[in-house]
Amino acid sequence: MLNGIVVVNKPRGVTSSDCVYKLRKILQIRKIGHAGTLDPEVNGVLPIAIGQATKLIELMHEKPKSYIGSGMFGKATDSYDLDGTTTAEEKIVTPFTSDEIISGMKKLTGKIDQVPPIYSAVRVNGKRLYEYARENIPVERPKRKVNIYSYELTQDPEYDPLEKTESFNFAIRCSKGTYVRSLVNDLGEELGVPAVMTSLTRTSSSGFDLSQAVDLETIEKEIDYPEKWLQPIDSFFVDLPQLQISPDQFKRVSNGASIKLNTTYAKVALVYNGHIKAIYQRQGKIYRPEMMLLKNE
């Protein structure tokens, strides 16, 4: 049985669930799930856990995500991207300088309260926001605390003198739960003009980046060579201290027993026969199991 993480390079025009469904059919595997939904028109890194790696999904969500994208000043939509209905338009007579845009981005960096787009999957009273939007039912969107580690302008903005709009490119590194569409909309609000996101690519997620991503067609062609497209479970724990355990210790670990270890780390990955078999956490003078990965081969 395969165990590991497939870093899929999701194309535009398909949902994250579509990718999971297609990969399930290709691999003929039932234990499978993705970590972090991408909107249909967003492409890039979509980590999909299979086999024992599905135990990691919650941990995978906790790691920062990175994006590159583009936006435009002069127009706003109800979805904060080009799929939505236009809600505001304003001719940009005097284009913003790079410094002005960077200043606005800095105000949106750090720990902030973010309001999600009305067209999003956030639940309010058991119902998703996009369902309220489609039914034209007013609803208060809850603010959510997110961490924007960096929000950067990646090149000088471009002004269109005919359309009187201004386009800009950005790079963002952020915590889970962040809506990049909202950050583009909020940047417009900081500068006092409508703004809309025009494209977005996720460049990293769950500790994996685009250089490790493969498309589903490649996986289908290379189905017999998983080493070409499957990231081992151990690769997810590269930042965690690892400790080799003896056969006797492994017997105890296999039974979920607490053990004493010659280390003081708060959390440690236990390795046996070259693979991580469990994650143990220190409690007082002993270590107790936090996650069992006994089938990780």
Curated annotation (Swiss-Prot):
Q: Which InterPro entries match?
A: PsdUridine_synth_cat_dom_sf, PsdUridine_synth_N, tRNA_psdUridine_synth_TruB, TruB_C
**What is the uppermost EC class here?**
isomerase
User: GO biological process annotations for this chain's record?
Assistant: mRNA pseudouridine synthesis; tRNA pseudouridine synthesis
Q: Record keywords: Isomerase included?
A: yes
Catalytic reaction list = uridine(55) in tRNA = pseudouridine(55) in tRNA
UniProt KW keywords? Isomerase, tRNA processing
Role noted for this protein: Responsible for synthesis of pseudouridine from uracil-55 in the psi GC loop of transfer RNAs.
Family under the similarity heading: Belongs to the pseudouridine synthase TruB family. Type 1 subfamily.
HAMAP family hit by this protein: TruB_bact
For this entry, the protein name equals tRNA pseudouridine synthase B
Say which species the protein is native to.
Answer: Lactobacillus johnsonii (strain CNCM I-12250 / La1 / NCC 533)
